[in-house]
């Protein structure tokens, strides 16, 4: 009876260890997915910034051309 309890306790111990390893791997996989979304968000923000800067530059050059035209009275 005592040896049977020992073996059952040993099997329970091994099962608990393997379960904790599985949970650790699962949480590591979930963390990787979160990092991908953060990287994607960062890349979208960077693209948005470059588009906004390009639009501001083109609008600024348009305004400057109009001002130069009105100052020179060549319009």
UniProtKB/Swiss-Prot annotation:
It is found in: Secreted. InterPro entries: Antimicrobial_frog_2, Frog_antimicrobial_propeptide. Keywords: Amphibian defense peptide, Antibiotic, Antimicrobial, Cleavage on pair of basic residues, Fungicide, Secreted, Signal. GO terms for biological process: antimicrobial humoral immune response mediated by antimicrobial peptide; defense response to fungus; defense response to Gram-negative bacterium; defense response to Gram-positive bacterium; killing of cells of another organism. It comes from the Eukaryota. Residues 25-40 form a propeptide. One of its GO terms (cellular component) is extracellular region. The keyword Glycosyltransferase does not apply. Residues 1-24 form the signal peptide. Pfam families: Antimicrobial_2 (PF08023), FSAP_sig_propep (PF03032). Coiled coil: none annotated. Expressed by the skin glands. Has antimicrobial activity against Gram-positive bacteria S.aureus ATCC 2592 (MIC=10.0 uM), S.aureus ATCC 43300 (MIC=10.0 uM) and B.subtilis (MIC=30.0 uM), against Gram-negative bacteria E.coli ML-35P (MIC=10.0 uM), P.aeruginosa PA01 (MIC=2.5 uM) and P.aeruginosa ATCC 27853 (MIC=2.5 uM) and against fungus C.albicans ATCC 2002 (MIC=10.0 uM). Belongs to the frog skin active peptide (FSAP) family. Brevinin subfamily. This is Rugosin-LK2.
């Amino acid at each position: 009876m005592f040896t049977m309890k020992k073996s059952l306790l040993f099997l329970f111990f091994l099962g608990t260890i393997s379960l904790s390893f599985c949970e650790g791997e699962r949480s590591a996989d979930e963390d990787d997915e979160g990092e991908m979304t953060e990287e994607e968000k960062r890349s979208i923000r960077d693209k948005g910034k470059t588009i906004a800067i390009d639009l501001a530059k083109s609008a600024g050059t348009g305004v400057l051309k109009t001002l130069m035209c009105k100052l020179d009275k060549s319009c």
